[in-house]
From Swiss-Prot:
<dbReference type="GO" id="GO:0030849">
    <property type="term" value="C:autosome"/>
</dbReference>
<dbReference type="GO" id="GO:0007141">
    <property type="term" value="P:male meiosis I"/>
</dbReference>
<keyword id="KW-0158">Chromosome</keyword>
<keyword id="KW-0479">Metal-binding</keyword>
<feature type="zinc finger region" description="C2H2-type 1">
    <location>
        <begin position="33"/>
        <end position="56"/>
    </location>
</feature>
<dbReference type="GO" id="GO:0005634">
    <property type="term" value="C:nucleus"/>
</dbReference>
<dbReference type="GO" id="GO:0051308">
    <property type="term" value="P:male meiosis chromosome separation"/>
</dbReference>
<keyword id="KW-0677">Repeat</keyword>
<keyword id="KW-0131">Cell cycle</keyword>
<keyword id="KW-0159">Chromosome partition</keyword>
<keyword id="KW-0863">Zinc-finger</keyword>
<dbReference type="InterPro" id="IPR013087">
    <property type="entry name" value="Znf_C2H2_type"/>
</dbReference>
<keyword id="KW-0539">Nucleus</keyword>
<comment type="function">
    <text>Specifically required in males for proper segregation of autosomal bivalents at meiosis I. Expression is required in the male germ line prior to spermatocyte stage S4. May have a role as a bridging molecule maintaining adhesion to hold autosome bivalents together via heterochromatic connections.</text>
</comment>
<keyword id="KW-0862">Zinc</keyword>
<comment type="similarity">
    <text>Belongs to the Teflon family.</text>
</comment>
<feature type="region of interest" description="Disordered">
    <location>
        <begin position="80"/>
        <end position="131"/>
    </location>
</feature>
Amino acid sequence: MSKFLDMLSGSQCVSLEKCGDVVVSTNDCMIALYCHFCRDLFTQLPEFLRHLQSNHSDVLHFTKEHNVYSVEELLSGEQDKAHEDAQSAGHNSSSGDSRSLMNSEDSRAIDGSEENSDNSPVKPEQIGKQNEINLLAEVTNILLQTNDKERINDELKPESGVFKGARKKANNESSSLKICDLKSHTIARTSRKRMSLVKNHILRVLDRDLSAKLEMKPLEPNSKLPITEPIQEDNIPGTCFQTPPKPIPSLSQLSVRKSSLTEANHICTKYATNKTAPTVPKLLNNVPKSILTSQQAQVNSDSSEINETYHISEAGSQVTKTTKSFPVKINQIEILQPLKLPKTLITPINEEGVSDQMENSTKNINNAQRKKENPKKFFKKPSELGIKTQGSPNKFLNIIKSKANPIIVNRVQTTSAKASTNKIQIRFNDKTKGFASEFNSTKIRKLKMENCVDLKTEDPCDNTNMRLNKMATIGSCEILKAVGLPAITDNAIEAIMLLPDELETMRKKADQFTKIYRKYDSIWNYRKIFPPAKPDFISQKIFALTREVNKTMLCNLANSDIKGIINQISVWHYNIYTQYIDLDTISEIARYTLKVFSFLPVSFAYFCKCCDDIFILKKEYLKHLISHQVRFQCTKCIKVFKYKGYYEKHLRNAHP
């Protein structure tokens, strides 16, 4: 062997390099090649040679690609492939037998070549022939391999065409799939099939649900078809939606008492006044009554004890068409003669006595009315109603009744020769002066009745609200007068009610208040300040403003009064700019006040009088004020209560 190595090293065409050693394992009888450069172990020679050529070419300096080991690599690869093909296609015995025979023949040929190559000594001519033999064997092996692959593919193709074999690689056709690759491919294929089945099932369910929604219910076999022919209206019986006529009552049923009649009583008496004139007086109560016409005011109503019977004759012809009105039609009314009253109720009256007593009564009435209707200093005097003095020729007796001492007003019918108009006598008792206010309350109503003027119904709630609003206006006007700004509530107050000296004093107070109010810009400019001030800070500023105003102007105003003044000034200033476009059209007093408050912005805020809350919107402010309205307030400690029970309990516990 040493001679052979010396021959190879001595020749110029062969250069040898020691790249590794052979390592033997005694436990499992395995041989491995040890690399000197990277100290790795390789179990096969082709792998070791490929490792040297790829990783250590810079040290070994390979000049060309060596194919000495290519045949051995192919043979070793063919053996591995034969084992894999035998395992994958074990069901086909014929293909396995043929492949094993071919592999055995190739192995024999290779063994023979290896034995020949191992003989000693080897000449160059023999080496060249051996290379040619190796090339021929390699070519034949490649051809056999391709033929075997084509034959195996033809045999394994299924007839149905659904089965798909292993995918071929375009770059390396010689390498086939391993067992692990085949298993993963099979698993992936089966999973795809299962997922496709699940997908198809889901799609079928969705289609079924959609079709069930859109599908209409089939018609029943016994169902009737809709009518397509026009309806014959002549065959349909007519329907009457009117109420059937009520039976006409008999004459005995129509005999009723006068006290039980309501509206029919007025209609009957109206018809009776056109024929006969009454002679019995009528009692007038101080309670407001319903609206009376000029003809109804002349009707003489007796006491509730008088009975009147109305005989109503049936109509000659009844109307066949029914209506919603009263079923009985009144054609004729007969009134019985009135009862004769005793002579003590009716006393003779002289014209002169009537005129004297009438003058005295009117004087007392005027005096009582003057005491009640004193005009306020800061409001216009209300206009009085005009009173007509002309009397009608058909006037009758009127009785004004009070609780303890009635005042009787009797009418006396005179001839046209003695007097042109009828006069009224008022008989006063000794204690009638105490009831002058009650008589005064009904004076305007009595005058309207005498002059045929319709009375309007009076709502006590409306009167109460008007009285409360009037008192609130008076209170706000008195507060504004303390700071010299009463013209904010009414522009005509200063021009009509105040004297020139008082007007000058009011303007000085207004200027003084304006100078003080101008310092507190955080109050009147609340909406322009950013960030807005907190309610606690604003309440402190209002308290300081109240203290300064009381000290400077010598008045005693509370924080709630100052807040009310601020709100009224802001609202008035806003209304001036929104209601009047041309400032020349407003009055002189309003123009002066507007000039004094020229520093105020148009936007403002509402300050609650009862708490420290501040509001920008008027609706929210009014809604908040309702929460402060209470019905019960203690006069001693000024506490408010929502319910009467709480108020009484407070009085028992806190103020025994």
